[in-house]
A protein has these predicted regions:
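Short strand-turn segments of transmembrane beta-barrel domains in outer membranes
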Residues: 196-198, 206-217, 225-256, 273-277, ...
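Outer membrane beta-barrel strand-and-loop segments of large Gram-negative receptors
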Residues: 385-391, 426-428, 432-436, 527, ...
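Periplasmic N-terminal accessory/gating domains of Gram-negative outer-membrane beta-barrel systems
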Residues: 81, 88-91, 110-216, 226, ...
Length: 773
């Protein structure tokens, strides 16, 4: 652990030197007067100088290394009047401000564009997508309201496998390889069984940062991607409520102050409560009687609670609790159910006279899932964790720093039916200790972000060093060349296989015991999964809000662990194979096997929005392969081409009408073809004789894995919204939507013996009403 101590000492020395520099600084938080919410992406500038910054997700800003003297500070944001104040700074002074923006009847679109450009000027955009509530609402809401799961499907590099139990695959990574955070706590199951709904209520979201590759050192423990969700606080000025009903379900929100924020004292306490759920399992047969026999047997309930404390200087404490649940019940076939409960606290503080921002958090979570099938003993999985973290932030004009340390205690338990019907149980405990350092250095046209992560896996006694690097070169004010890369590790394993097109149940393991000890003739002592990323891209900021990006990426998953679908023997023999190891023998006897993976491709994106319209186009060209002990194959989510076109515009009197559309075109997924059918005769017990009076079952002779391709997939989703402003606070909105508007018959699966075909969801009209009070 000497490496962790060294990183901590270095970071604290840097933080100390930053806190006692010889130049003046201005720091603070920006709020809006209506609800007391923080204002991310507000433009903070010193007029007549080059000093400026956009507020971060916490509404925080720091203008550092300023000369002493007089300055005119300006803060601006869309829909608000500019805030201006005159400041006299003394040498070595750190001035703390609480800024409250007042609403304006004049829409200054250039203020938002300026803030967005300031934000983009301070980041490397390689494989990073910032989603705001405005962006999330650009997608037609298939359930009557916008959802994060629907927007993720249009991000280049993300593949979604279907409406019924579909999963998200990010540039060759599987769902278990995606790290999902909610206000700092890890969410292991963020999406419901019905594929277009997440556990997050869009109206509680402040921002979402999606990294599809090459993410920085503060994130780890996963091989593929990061989805970092931040929620807002409750209204700090007045009590509000929001309720919506639609053909799929409902949503309820209540919020307000427990201690009101006032102009004289910004200190406050507020609450935010959210509940959303579904009733489509009950209403589906009545509203959509033309659905096939599988219907929509889904049910979910999500609860979210947050209490936020704000001090007079902007310091913040959040207490958060969640409970998510999901059920998919196919009578006579299977029943999958899971619940996820979590809670904890987060502290954000910037001490007086300090130029750094401190953040700490502690959370506990409990995830439980079960799968019940006829003639098979129930499968269960438990994932329990306790995580604590501490971070130090510094944002300067030419140098920024983020140092953090974390401790995660994880417990997994998985029960399943073994090869002879015996109930098997695996239970593991582990502790993960980690520390990381991210820096950002601006030198001329270059912005360089080196980072390093130390991750210790206690159950493996393994200490991993993971270097990360981002580089941006500004060709001009509008054109940037970007690079991002690094090395990543993961201990968590799922019981799903790359051969499973749909799997509503995932078991979780930390350090599986029943796994190969050799892979392709090489002995493997350490069972940590490993990957490397590299991304090279270019971005262009055009007139107004036009953004164009192009990226080439490669992900080398050079050690992965997959659930073994080839197991046919008990794990009792220790016989070496032809290579002198146990790899081939383990390929047929172990519950888990090693694999290698490779993903590479090209992603293109164009994004353009005006006052009353939006246009978004994303195209992905991707290649994914897997290699196990014996064969190289493509997994079922290897989609070669994927195109998404999204558009929307507002019209009518007061622009109260809104129309949105999304069209998705994708090449066919791989599948394993059938060569023929045969009579499968069972042997009598304890001998090789067959019963001459017994008829065999119908067996399938399979072709090599995933060498066939399904037909092309395409679908159009539409929505039309009308908003009525009833009073200052009261607003009524009606939404009519069409999923799969032209009723494209996209294949879901076919029964190999009866040749019955089941398609993805047909045309589904939806209707929703929402009322804000």
């Amino acid at each position: 652990m000497k490496s962790v101590t060294l990183i901590a000492a270095l970071a604290l020395m840097l933080a100390g030197s930053l806190a006692f520099g010889q130049t003046a600084s201005i720091k603070g938080f920006v709020y809006e007067s209506g609800s007391g919410q923080t204002v991310p992406m507000a433009s903070v500038t010193l007029e007549g100088t080059k000093f400026g910054q956009a507020t971060d997700v916490n509404g925080y800003f720091l203008l550092a290394k300023l000369p002493a003297g007089p300055f005119d500070l300006r803060v601006s944001f869309l829909g608000f009047s500019d805030y201006r104040t005159h400041l006299e700074l003394a040498p070595d002074e750190v001035r703390s401000l609480i800024i409250v923006l007042e609403p304006s009847t004049i829409e200054l679109k250039e203020a938002t564009i300026t803030a967005e450009r300031q934000r983009l000027a301070g980041i490397n955009p390689a494989s990073v997508h910032r989603l705001t509530p405005v962006a999330l609402n650009r997608i037609p809401g298939l359930s009557g309201q916008a959802d994060l799961a629907e927007y993720l499907q249009v991000i280049p590099g993300i593949i979604f496998t279907g409406d019924r139990g579909g999963q998200f695959y990010v540039r060759g990574g599987e769902p278990v390889n995606n790290l999902v955070k909610l206000d700092g706590m890890t969410i292991v199951s963020p999406f419901h069984s019905v594929g277009f709904t997440s556990v997050f209520d869009t109206q509680t979201i402040s921002s979402v940062d999606v990294s599809t590759a090459g993410f920085g050192a503060q994130y780890g423990g996963r091989l593929s991607s990061v989805i970092d969700v931040k929620t807002r606080a409750g209204n700090r000025k007045e009590f509000c409520a929001d309720g919506s009903l639609n053909t799929f379900g409902y949503s309820l929100i209540a919020e307000g102050p427990l201690k009101k924020m006032t102009p004289e004292n910004p200190g406050s306490v507020s609450f935010l409560l959210s509940n959303k759920g579904s009733w489509i399992r009950t209403t589906g047969p009545m509203l959509y009687p033309y659905l096939d026999s599988t219907g929509l047997p889904f049910r979910y309930d999500d609860y979210f609670a947050k209490v936020s404390f704000i001090g007079s200087k902007g310091d913040q404490v959040d207490i958060i609790g969640t409970r998510f649940s999901d059920v998919a019940d196919y009578p006579g076939l299977m029943r999958s159910a899971w619940t996820s409960t979590a809670g904890g606290a987060r502290l954000l503080v910037s001490p007086s006279g300090s130029r750094v921002l401190f953040e700490s958090s502690a959370f506990v979570s409990d995830f439980r899932a079960s799968l019940t099938q006829p003639d098979i003993k129930p499968r269960q999985t438990f994932y329990n964790s306790a995580e604590a973290s501490f971070k130090v932030h510094y944002r300067g004009p030419l140098f920024s720093l983020l140092w953090g340390t974390e401790m995660n205690v994880i417990h997994t338990l998985h029960t399943f039916q073994g090869i002879k019907g015996i109930l098997m149980e695996d239970e593991y405990f582990t502790t993960e200790l980690l520390s990381y350092l991210e820096t950002k250095i601006t030198a001329g046209n270059f912005m360089i972000e080196p980072g390093f992560r130390i991750h210790y896996y206690a159950d493996k006694s393994d200490l991993r060093g993971e270097p990360r690097l981002k580089v941006r070169y500004s060709v001009s004010d509008r054109i940037n060349l970007n690079f991002a890369g690094g090395f990543y590790s993961q201990n968590l394993v799922s019981t799903t296989s790359t051969e499973d097109v749909v799997n509503l149940f995932q078991g979780y393991y930390i350090g599986p015991f029943w796994i190969q000890s050799d892979f392709k003739g090489d002995h493997i002592d350490n069972k940590i999964q490993l990957a490397g990323h590299a991304v090279l891209g270019a971005s262009y900021l055009g007139p107004g809000s036009l953004k164009l990006t192009a990226e080439l990426y490669v992900k080398d998953y050079y050690r992965m662990i997959s659930y073994n679908r080839n197991k046919i023997y008990e794990d009792v023999l220790r016989v070496k194979d032809d290579n002198g190891g146990y790899g081939t023998r383990g390929y047929l006897t172990k519950y888990f096997i090693f694999e290698k993976g490779l993903a590479y491709g090209l992603d293109l994106m164009a994004d353009w929005s005006g006052r009353y319209y939006t246009v978004y186009i994303a195209y992905s060209l991707g290649y994914v392969t897997r290699q196990d002990e014996l064969i190289t194959y493509v997994p079922h989510f290897d989609r070669r081409h994927n195109l998404n076109v999204v558009g929307g515009f507002r019209f009518g009197r007061s622009h109260a009408w809104s129309a949105k559309a999304r069209w998705n075109l994708g090449s066919g997924f791989p599948f394993t073809q059938s060569v023929g059918l045969y009579e499968d005769l069972s042997l009598l017990a304890n001998n090789f004789m067959m019963d001459p009076l017994m008829s065999g079952e119908l067996g399938v002779w399979y072709a090599p894995i995933n060498e066939g391709r399904l037909p092309w997939y395409h679908r159009l989703d539409l929505s039309l919204e009308r908003t009525w402003k009833l009073s200052r606070k009261m607003e009524l909105q009606a939404v009519f939507g069409l999923m799969n508007a032209y009723n494209r018959q996209n294949v879901f699966y076919m029964d190999r013996t009866t040749y019955d075909r089941i398609d993805q969801l047909p045309v589904l009209p939806t209707l929703g009403l929402s009322l804000k009070l």
